[in-house]
From Swiss-Prot:
Catalytic activity of the protein: (6S)-5,6,7,8-tetrahydrofolate + NADP(+) = 7,8-dihydrofolate + NADPH + H(+)
Residue positions binding substrate: I5, W6, A7, E27, R32, R57, S120
UniProt keyword Hydrolase, yes or no: no
Family, per entry: Belongs to the dihydrofolate reductase family.
Organism of this sequence: Mycoplasma pneumoniae (strain ATCC 29342 / M129 / Subtype 1)
Protein's name according to its UniProt entry: Dihydrofolate reductase
Length: 160
């Protein structure tokens, strides 16, 4: 399954420069637990913004830069330059998961292809420059979990 995972505030804000506009430990733990030991796909700017150690994941970096050489962050990395063929083995596969982890351009390209979405909504409004507008109509809300500072909504694509 191809799943997009992200956090946003109540206005759809997902970033400020190349960082998160908030620092919520429980939400970061949710992201870590969900993606640990999994395959993740992200853009090069998102990869470069990660902490120095981002281990225990297979990271695929989507970039148009044919000369991109990712710095070592303690994880297996592979650079890819197109996503359509890459995501095929994951699509609709119940036991093989690929998590789409940003940034905004990668989400915009891949959310329509996703089997599922995992969306953390941070309570409150923050300042930043990266917003994500998502058409949720192809998806059905299947579960929602509330925490003190955010809630997590799980969506699955509606079979057509």
């Amino acid at each position: 399954m191809v799943k997009a995972i992200w956090a946003m505030d109540q206005n759809g804000l997902i970033g400020n420069g190349n960082s998160l506009p908030w620092r919520i430990k429980a939400e970061l733990q949710h992201f870590r637990q969900t993606t640990l030991h999994q395959d993740v796909l992200m853009g090069s700017a998102t990869y470069l913004s990660l902490p120095p150690v981002f281990s225990e994941r297979n990271v695929y970096i989507l970039t148009r830069n044919l000369n991109f050489n990712p710095p070592d962050k303690g994880c297996l990395t592979k650079v890819i330059h197109e996503y359509e063929n890459f995501i095929q083995p994951y699509l609709h596969h119940p036991d093989k998961h690929l998590y789409i982890c940003g940034g905004a351009q990668v989400y915009e390209q891949l959310i329509p292809r996703c089997d599922a979405l995992i969306v953390s909504t941070i309570f409150g409004k923050y300042t930043g420059d990266k917003y994500l507008k998502v058409d949720f109509s192809p998806f059905e809300l299947t579960k929602e979990i509330s925490f003190a500072e955010f809630k997590v909504a799980y969506y699955h694509k509606i079979a057509r």
